[in-house]
């Protein structure tokens, strides 16, 4: 009885205490722009400044907190870049207090006096969205948002320039939540100036279909959403960047943008021949061979337009023109794991290329009422590409570097020895190590046109979530390609026992290949609420795909020596096959080769039926289901003198599960699983032997089975506001059953390969990562960030030698990566100590001598300083090292120093003169190594890494308000205000790699 009374008493006291809690609410607003201020700190203090409670304003500036009792209090509001605001409030009669809008003023005077009490937070988490504050990341003057993204915690930049955030590749860029240059992330990353960006949000965006239906179609994309600074999203802004560099380098950009309440228009222009290297200084340790694959010149014109009429009509449009010229030289050395003994190969190649492309995309979303949504997405692409290539390659049955320092030069002596018997045999030939030598050249050209369109209609049938969607997609494409290839091959171990020195053959061919394809589909979905926040979702989709390729091949391999020598004397040039064909002694049709010509026609009829269950709860979301995909394919194939007509009927199965749990508004757990079935290609299933290239023979396999891949991902994030501490971890796992691998039969006499696809089990990989970012002190002046990755790959493949029993080769690879940075920042200075580590442990079953236990690490400081008189300095020094390679030449040290110095001029510093220095010590290399189950490959490219560049940058703000003009005048940064935009102009004269290219 006493326990019951005590329990009731405690309950009554708790209820009384709760009843006495008074709620205080309000909205924090920027007085100059009337925009809400996000992430402001709101503190409730007693009259003697004793802390009681606190809160953080949300993205709408709203906050709420509780007062314990009636009385007089102080409400203190602080936010980075604003003056502290204190209000005296009185709580009476137990009533709540609604304060409405609370205006706060920008801290312009304090900034000029260089008085800052707290630094901007680097990252904040809101459910499954990462919000990065651009003011917390110092980038070099004039830089674009690519430089900003590289500095974000959890960001990874690959060798091809693609960017991953938290382990997922970024597929789309948004600006203020609106689509920007859809389908092209690099245009935004390399052209939007950092000076206009306020915050960056990283999250997974669902597809158009999933947004309106809730049905997960597996088309989720990772996006970066760049928010424009307050006051800069209205009016006209522009900037221009003109430059000149040593070694004929240039990198120019231009940008103009117009904003008002409904319209947003941006135009870009850029031209450079620096491989889009970006800006030196402040970047920290770099990678090996990153973005230095040859010499590349590019030009771009882009236009992006957004329109929004409240919630009724939204429109996004983009148009882009790209031109590129490439001049790429590569040297490759490979060890191929063919069996217990390796095969070695070396090659040198010279490639020239140029391309032009137009890409246009449009999106119209109309919401005529609260129950209806209509969306239309048309797009087109027009592209033309030219290429010239020349290469020399050789294969060896022993490590050639044990015999000679330059294997290709020595192998070329063997070819000359065939014509001049007075020359001695090459060292490789004397040792019996030279298997074959190939020299080849080619000219190719292609032009393509593609049209696509999507129309989607969604209707909500009730407020409970019942809805129906109808969608249709259609596409049409055509490609016309021409290519001329000339190959001379020498095989040195064939018939040696019979006294022959070598076997030699030529392959001269001209191909004309038109391709046509089109497709259409019709989709219907229905979502039924079973009970509160629980939905059953059904969908059906029919797709028809058609494609036809009709390649005509003309064979000149039976040329006489006189004809072959005549062709060898012609200098290749773009689309210059007429220079060769014009010398033919017979009409072109007489060289038509029906066996080498190829015709194929596909007709695919695909049905997709999906059933999903979806549960929405305050703490978690759960959806699971499966898709069944019956498919019928009709295939007609004419090749190698065979005519084949076949039909295949298969059924694919794809289960899916997505679970999200919310621990709090800043802490989430997500588990995702998707299984997919994939079928072997129709050509792989045909019992045909393609020996058109005697050194690369391909066979089909009618017995191939479909493969099934399991993909699993676990993701967790958390944020501790008090310590400005963010952490993220993820685990990815993928395993494929009956994956398709090429079984390679190696002929040690010719160096040729016969490949045939086979099913194999054992391919799987796992990757995990952990990101931790925290302020060390309460003001956020000191910060540390670490990003750790661990990956394991089990790669399998088939190998056999001279037709003997095939062997299963396994390469087990463990990779550990670490990127750590510790930094100090104040109003005018940021100093970072950066370090990276990559450890690679690999074990090869058939080739123990090819095992790897290597280290790549780099470390060094980066500094960014801004002076009161408008001068800015950015520099980084990085020592990059390799260790553990059996080839001692790979164990190198590279000390790379980059720097940039700029000075602002005129009132408000709209004019900036800047000088940049890349690789001041001339030590950066372009050598890289790759390892698979089949081979180890070392590649080195030509590049220009060390040069200097002078920039003159001017920025303009015509219509924007006072705050926008101030922000533009001072470069958009909250400190000594000197960062300009980044832009450009087209170069004067043709860039290297362009024009009428000849060898």
Protein language model features and the residues they cover:
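Face-selective signature of the C-terminal outer-membrane beta-barrel domain
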Residues: 320, 359-367, 371-383, 431-636, ...
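Short Pro-Gly-centered beta-turn/loop motif in secreted/extracellular proteins
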Residues: 37-38, 64-72
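A short, amphipathic beta-strand motif
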Residues: 22-30, 61, 100-102
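A short, solvent-exposed loop/turn motif at the edges and junctions
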Residues: 45-50, 72-88
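Membrane-proximal, glycine/serine-rich, low-complexity loop/turn segments characteristic
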Residues: 20, 60-62, 76, 82-83, ...
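Short, acidic Ser/Thr/Gly-rich low-complexity loop/linker segments typical of extracellular
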Residues: 47-62
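Extracellular/periplasm-exposed beta-strand and loop segments of Gram-negative cell-envelope proteins
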Residues: 280, 289-295, 328-336, 343-355, ...
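Short, ordered, surface-exposed loop/turn motifs in non-cytosolic proteins
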Residues: 32-46, 125
């Amino acid at each position: 009885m006493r326990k019951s009374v005590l329990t009731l008493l405690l309950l009554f006291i708790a209820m009384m205490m709760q009843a006495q809690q008074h709620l205080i609410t309000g909205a924090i607003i920027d007085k100059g722009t009337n925009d809400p201020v996000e992430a402001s700190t709101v503190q409730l203090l007693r009259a003697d400044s004793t802390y009681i409670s606190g809160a953080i304003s949300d993205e709408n500036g709203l906050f709420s907190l509780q007062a314990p009792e009636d009385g007089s209090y102080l409400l203190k509001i602080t936010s980075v870049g604003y003056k502290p605001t204190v209000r005296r409030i009185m709580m009476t009669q137990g009533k709540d207090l609604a304060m409405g809008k609370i205006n706060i003023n920008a801290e312009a005077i304090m900034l000029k006096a260089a008085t800052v009490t707290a630094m901007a937070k680097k990252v904040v988490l809101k459910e499954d969205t990462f919000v990065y504050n651009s003011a917390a990341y110092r980038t070099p003057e004039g830089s674009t948002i690519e430089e900003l993204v590289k500095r974000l915690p959890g960001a990874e930049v690959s060798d091809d320039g693609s960017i991953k955030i938290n382990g997922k590749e970024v597929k789309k860029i948004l600006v203020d939540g609106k689509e920007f240059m859809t389908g092209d992330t690099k245009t935004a990353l390399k052209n939007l100036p950092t000076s206009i960006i306020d915050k960056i949000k990283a999250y997974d965006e669902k597809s158009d279909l999933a947004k309106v239906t809730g049905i997960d179609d597996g088309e989720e994309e990772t996006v970066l959403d760049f928010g424009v600074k307050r006051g800069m999203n209205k009016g006209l802004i522009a900037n221009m960047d003109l430059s000149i560099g040593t070694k004929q380098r240039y990198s120019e950009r231009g940008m103009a943008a117009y904003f008002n309440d409904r319209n947003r228009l941006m135009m870009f222009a850029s031209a450079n021949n620096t491989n889009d290297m970006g800006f030196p200084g402040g970047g920290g340790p770099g990678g090996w061979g990153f973005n230095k694959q040859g010499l590349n010149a590019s030009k771009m014109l882009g236009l992006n337009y957004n329109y929004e009429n409240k919630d009724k009509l939204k429109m996004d449009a983009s148009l882009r023109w790209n031109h590129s010229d490439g001049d790429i030289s590569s040297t490759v050395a490979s060890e191929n794991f063919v069996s217990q003994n390796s095969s070695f190969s070396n090659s040198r190649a010279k490639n020239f290329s140029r391309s032009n492309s137009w890409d246009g995309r449009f999106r119209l979303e109309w919401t005529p009422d609260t129950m209806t949504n209509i969306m239309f997405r048309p797009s087109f692409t027009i592209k033309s590409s030219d290429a010239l290539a020349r290469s020399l390659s050789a294969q060896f049955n022993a490590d050639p570097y044990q015999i000679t320092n330059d294997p290709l030069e020595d192998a070329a002596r063997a070819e000359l020895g065939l014509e001049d018997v007075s020359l001695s045999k090459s060292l490789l030939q004397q040792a019996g190590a030279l298997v074959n030598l190939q020299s080849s050249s080619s000219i190719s050209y292609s032009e393509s046109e593609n049209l696509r369109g999507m129309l989607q209609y969604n209707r909500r049938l009730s407020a409970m979530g019942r809805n129906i969607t109808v969608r249709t997609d259609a596409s049409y494409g055509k490609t016309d390609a021409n290519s001329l290839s000339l190959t001379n091959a020498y095989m040195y171990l064939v018939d040696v026992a019979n006294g022959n020195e070598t076997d030699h053959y030529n392959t001269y061919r001209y191909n004309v290949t038109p391709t046509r394809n089109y497709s259409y589909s019709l989709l219907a979905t229905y979502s039924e609420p079973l009970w509160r926040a629980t939905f059953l979702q059904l969908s059906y989709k029919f797709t028809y795909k058609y494609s036809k390729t009709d390649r005509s091949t003309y064979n000149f391999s039976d040329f006489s020596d006189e004809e072959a020598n005549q062709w060898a004397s012609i200098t290749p040039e773009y689309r210059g096959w007429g220079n060769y064909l014009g010398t033919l002694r017979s009409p072109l049709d007489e060289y038509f080769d029906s066996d080498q010509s190829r015709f194929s026609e596909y007709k695919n009829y695909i049905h997709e039926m999906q059933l999903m269950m979806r549960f929405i709860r305050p703490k978690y979301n759960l959806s699971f289901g499966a898709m069944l995909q019956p498919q019928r394919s009709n295939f007609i194939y004419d090749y190698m003198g065979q005519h084949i007509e076949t039909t295949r009927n298969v059924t694919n199965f794809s289960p899916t599960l997505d679970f999200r749990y919310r621990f709090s508004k800043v802490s989430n757990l997500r588990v995702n699983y998707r299984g997919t079935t994939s079928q072997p290609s129709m050509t792989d299933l045909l019992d045909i032997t393609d020996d058109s290239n005697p050194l690369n023979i391909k066979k089909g396999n009618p017995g191939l089975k479909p493969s099934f891949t399991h993909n699993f991902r676990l993701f967790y994030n958390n944020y501790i506001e008090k310590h400005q501490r963010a952490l993220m971890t993820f685990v990815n796992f993928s395993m494929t059953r009956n994956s398709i691998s090429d079984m390679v039969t190696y002929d040690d006499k010719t160096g040729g390969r016969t490949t045939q696809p086979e099913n194999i089990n054992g391919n799987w990989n796992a990757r995990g990562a952990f990101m931790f970012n925290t302020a060390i002190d309460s003001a956020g002046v000191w910060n540390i960030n670490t990003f750790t990755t661990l990956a394991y790959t089990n790669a399998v493949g088939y190998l056999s030698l001279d037709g003997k029993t095939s062997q299963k080769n396994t390469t087990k690879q463990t990779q550990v990566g670490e990127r750590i940075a510790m930094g100090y920042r104040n109003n005018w200075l940021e100093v970072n100590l950066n370090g990276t580590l990559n450890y690679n442990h690999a074990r090869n079953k058939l080739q123990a001598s090819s095992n790897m236990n290597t280290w790549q690490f780099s470390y060094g400081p980066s500094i960014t300083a801004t002076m009161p008189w408008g001068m800015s300095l950015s520099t980084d020094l990085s020592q990059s090292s390799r260790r553990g390679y059996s080839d001692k030449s790979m164990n190198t040290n590279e000390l790379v120093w980059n720097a940039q110095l700029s000075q602002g001029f005129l009132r408000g510093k709209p004019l900036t003169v800047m000088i940049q220095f890349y690789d001041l010590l001339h030590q950066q290399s372009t050598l890289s190594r790759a390892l698979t189950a089949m081979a180890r490959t070392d590649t080195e490219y030509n590049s220009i890494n060390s040069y200097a560049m002078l920039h003159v940058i001017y920025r303009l703000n015509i219509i924007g308000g006072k705050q926008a003009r101030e922000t533009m005048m001072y470069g958009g940064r909250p400190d000594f205000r000197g960062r300009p935009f980044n832009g450009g102009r087209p170069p004067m004269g043709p860039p290297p790699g362009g024009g009428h290219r000849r060898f």
